[in-house]
Amino acid sequence: VEIPGVGSTTFLKTAVNAIRKHRGEKEFDAMEFLKIMREKRDELGISEEMMRRALNVGFSGGEKKRNEVLQMALLEPYLAVLDETDSGLDIDALRVAADGINSLRSPERTMIVITHYQRLLEYVVPDYVHVMADGKVVRSGGKELALELEEKGYSGVGDKAEAAA
């Protein structure tokens, strides 16, 4: 979502401090936040210029995805739902996003990664794979299920899963 008039850095600082306050942690002052944000930004290959722009205004698809991963890195959520994070990314941007996702994996964090393609799963290896059809999980398994889907399609993994195609 584009939000004209709201700077990306201002948005992130406000969001991070709201989370910290909720968790009973000390809020970051401007200098503390900028230091942490720059470290995370550099890890994700996000330019300083991009952070000076209004939130998502004029961002390419890849920039929006990188910004989403930056938000996740800064907010440190307990639960993250990543909906088609690989959509519209070239291979370099996909690797940056995957590296960001992998760097945030921990036993304290649950990530639900929604994708229709195997490509992302070459870089982010799932613990579990679930196939949904009509709002229900129709099949579950490990990373092997994703490989089977790529090879056989939804029709190859059973009648119920065929509806998900």
Residue spans of the language-model regions?
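ABC-family P-loop ATPase nucleotide-binding domains
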Residues: 1-78
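Walker B motif beta-strand of ABC-family P-loop ATPases
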Residues: 78-84
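Walker B catalytic motif
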Residues: 84-85, 92
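Conserved D-loop-proximal element of ABC-family nucleotide-binding domains
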Residues: 90-95, 140
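Helical segment within the ABC ATPase nucleotide-binding domain
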Residues: 94-107
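Conserved H-loop
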Residues: 108-124
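Conserved beta-strand-loop-alpha-helix hinge in the C-terminal portion
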Residues: 128, 132, 136-159
